Amino acid sequence: MAFVSIAPLASRCCVHKSFVSSREVKPLCRTIPTLGRCRRGKTVTPSISMCWTATVLDDGVQRRIANHHSNLWDDSFIQSLSTPYGETSYLERADKLIGEVKEIINSISVEDGELITPLNDLIQRLSIVDIIERLGIDRHFKNEIKSALDYVYSYWNEKGIGCGRECVITHLNSTALGLRTLRLHGYPVSSDVLEQFKDQNGQFACSAIQTEGEIKSVLNLFRASLIAFPGEKVMEEAEIFSTIYLKEALLTIPVCSLSREIAYVLEHGWHTNLPRLEARNYIDVFGQDPIYGTPNIKMTQKLLEIAKLEFNIFHSLQQKELKHLSRWWKDSVFSQLAFPRHRHVEYYTLASCIDIDPQHSSFRLGFAKISHLGTVLDDIYDTFGTMDELELFTAAVKRWHPSATKWLPEYMKGVYMMLYETVNEMAREADKSQGRDTLNYARQAWEAYIDSYMKEAKWISSGFLPTFEEYLDNGKVSFGYRIGTLQPILTLGTPFPHHILQEIDFPSSLNDLACSILRLKGDILTYQAERSRGEKSSCISCYMKDNPGSTEEDAVAYINGMVNKSLKELNWEFLRPDSNAPITSKKHAFDILRAFYHLYKHRDGFSVARNEIRNLVKTTVIEPVPL
């Protein structure tokens, strides 16, 4: 998980002034042994702006605490949320419209001679699939989507496709959209089809005057280029060309559905795109221009109404799940701890942005709970705990029994029991889906996670700077991607035999690449803040140690190159046609990476969850779509 802390602390022994009263403040700020706790119902809220160094009087323990802001989503606010969209009438209306759209889609197989002809039947099928997927309603049309793509693929050749099956000339828009869509659905298609759209100089060409049709073609070229596999130079060239083209187009075209779509795609791409956020955006895009993207205005209007209804119906389920999660947090020890980040609502938002299936409540809630646990443990190991306490907690996790709490300090006892109970509860839920005991999988993942934190704590304590390779090997585990992925996906209701799980979980290439990408990307955005509080180890500093004379800029450039290369390798591991694990089995693991990567577009979105992430919560969880 995104457990990297970025709070700028001056020293290892820093405790917030909220823990002390004015009469107790002396040089070095001596205070009472609160251990970061307060009475039930009274949370000590750290300030955003300052952090004081303090010493606990009774035992002389020196602690530091990051200046993380408090929980932004009060339980009373969450419990007050209400919506009418869980009523049966909305469900019935959505089901009726879904049936009507299926009839329209199935009728496309019979050309009407006007809208659907042998000269445009391929692009029309692709466009309909694309619209359905971007509106977030594709789970209702799986058979129709497969039928449409099978039809398109039957006419695919080494040069791509034209707009229709009887077109003798291939078309950039049809070929680019086809390449992207077919590849994402597991069809073996080569990027070599794009070579024919270069000029005699080997460059992608465009006309002197930008037309709407050309802009749409280049937009789909950009979208296709993001689904690149290793070694596909033409995809790299396509991405560079289309990025420049689209940025220039935004400066010249008026504000409209097309400009809004371009801006969204350039901002979120594919690896940082979240399906529910995308659906919310395209509801507005198609609402602004009902004929945008398809000639069948009747079908587009129905699809738009389905998307709005589905968004709001799921919104009613989100409220129920969020209320459960907020009560879980409020009634736990977490709400009494002042030092850690409280991001349970933000984690739930991520889960509900990548999985909107009503049957997957266990996945969404489990992901939020497990991720929040990981964040609290990160703040304990990274800042608050002493080395002796961390050794005790590490041993307790390996013992995995409630009796292990008797050796722990008071504030750790509650955290340990929440970890123990939550992991066991999720294991019982996963056992129902998998038909076998899954607790050992979870325990192994948590032990590895805690061990990686213990190693980092020792590095900080001793001032040791590891090699780049040693740091990354440990950092891939300490990021927490594995613990955030393993148990939640085992609750989905899909059986994961051992050989399938091995291609998703550790030590699979998919898991290793995801962990590497997130650790490297996280460090690029947080190393300066970590260095300011005395933490030497980061991929930046370790690279510079291994390469004397290199600068921070050199290190960042090298690591960005590693990330970009790894993203292409991850695309291949996710979509490769020869994999034993089907794409559907790997999708949640891949989407969890996209959720975390979304937070690291510009900065650590969890340590400071006030801007983009707060807006994400509001637009995808709190606020319904106007019908």
UniProtKB/Swiss-Prot annotation:
Pathway assigned to this chain's UniProt record: Terpene metabolism; oleoresin biosynthesis
Location(s), subcellular: Plastid, Chloroplast
Transit peptide, UniProt annotation: 1-21
Organism, scientific name: Picea glauca (White spruce)
Name of the top EC class for this enzyme: lyase
Keywords of this entry: Chloroplast, Lyase, Magnesium, Metal-binding, Plastid, Transit peptide
E.C. no: 4.2.3.26
Superkingdom of origin: Eukaryota
Residue positions binding Mg(2+) 2: D378, D382
Function of the molecule: Terpene synthase (TPS) involved in the biosynthesis of monoterpene natural products included in conifer oleoresin secretions and volatile emissions; these compounds contribute to biotic and abiotic stress defense against herbivores and pathogens. Catalyzes the conversion of (2E)-geranyl diphosphate (GPP) to (R)-linalool.
Cofactor: Mg(2+); Mn(2+)
Family stated for the protein in its record: Belongs to the terpene synthase family. Tpsd subfamily.
Lineage: Eukaryota, Viridiplantae, Streptophyta, Embryophyta, Tracheophyta
Annotated GO biological process: diterpenoid biosynthetic process; green leaf volatile biosynthetic process; monoterpenoid biosynthetic process
Pfam families tied to this protein: Terpene_synth (PF01397), Terpene_synth_C (PF03936)
Residues involved in Mg(2+) 3 binding: E530
CC annotations in GO: chloroplast
Catalytic activity: (2E)-geranyl diphosphate + H2O = (R)-linalool + diphosphate
Binding sites annotated in the UniProt record for Mg(2+) 1: D378, D382
Cofactor note (record): Binds 3 Mg(2+) or Mn(2+) ions per subunit.
MF annotations from Gene Ontology: lyase activity; magnesium ion binding; R-linalool synthase activity; terpene synthase activity
Domain notes: The Asp-Asp-Xaa-Xaa-Asp/Glu (DDXXD/E) motif is important for the catalytic activity, presumably through binding to Mg(2+).
Protein name: (R)-linalool synthase, chloroplastic
DDXXD motif, short sequence motif: residues: 378-382
